[in-house]
Amino acid sequence: MEKERDVAQEQATYEQESPNAERQEELKENEHQEKNAPEEQEKVREENGRQDAQKDEIGDPEKAKEEQNEELAAANAKIAELEAKIKEMENRYLRLYADFENFRRRTRREMEAAEKYRAQSLVSDLLPVLDNFERALKIKAEDEQAKSILQGMEMVYRSVLDALKKEGVEAIEAVGKPFDPHLHQAVMQVEDSNYEPNTVVEELQKGYKLKDRVIRPAMVKVSQ
């Protein structure tokens, strides 16, 4: 009997304590929710932000297409501008290259001409000397002494001609040749039945060439 009374007392005590335990659990749950409320709110805001961003990205299809077309047009315009600049630079390069090639060829020709005709100035200075030799050698010697002098002059004259010949200097052929204004300088026209018209009949002064360049044309008489 006493044992049954103890069990009943324990049951009553449990029933009294149960509401208090449930209340404590409820309070703990509320406290936990209050503590985590800011975090939950932040998560909600982030989720809403993501949804808004997705909506913005999707946006109006027509507007998005228009923006794409504008971007494409701007890109095409930039490409066209760059292509025009490249074309301009290519043309400038080609012009510079052509100018350089012309300069290089001209310089090479000038250097070759300078080497080829390096003796021209000296030859031009020697021509009056040759003229004097030729005039002196036409003099008829009256005695042995004069003949000896003329022979010595002729030797010197021949030596000078040989030296000039080694440099490419040669006399221009004149008498009996058709008149050539590039080689001959006509100072007189005469009638001469021994020659065809427009033929050199007499040479008044020798002409000379340095290789293929006329240093001095021959001074001549030409038949009519």
Swiss-Prot record:
One of its GO terms (molecular function) is protein homodimerization activity. One of its GO terms (cellular component) is cytoplasm. It comes from the Bacteria. Gene3D superfamilies: 3.90.20.20, Head domain of nucleotide exchange factor GrpE. Residues 20-67 have a biased composition (Basic and acidic residues). Residues 10-19 have a biased composition (Polar residues). Belongs to the GrpE family. Homodimer. Participates actively in the response to hyperosmotic and heat shock by preventing the aggregation of stress-denatured proteins, in association with DnaK and GrpE. It is the nucleotide exchange factor for DnaK and may function as a thermosensor. Unfolded proteins bind initially to DnaJ; upon interaction with the DnaJ-bound protein, DnaK hydrolyzes its bound ATP, resulting in the formation of a stable complex. GrpE releases ADP from DnaK; ATP binding to DnaK triggers the release of the substrate protein, thus completing the reaction cycle. This is Protein GrpE. It comes from Parageobacillus thermoglucosidasius (Geobacillus thermoglucosidasius). The lineage of its organism: Bacteria, Bacillati, Bacillota, Bacilli, Bacillales. The gene is grpE.
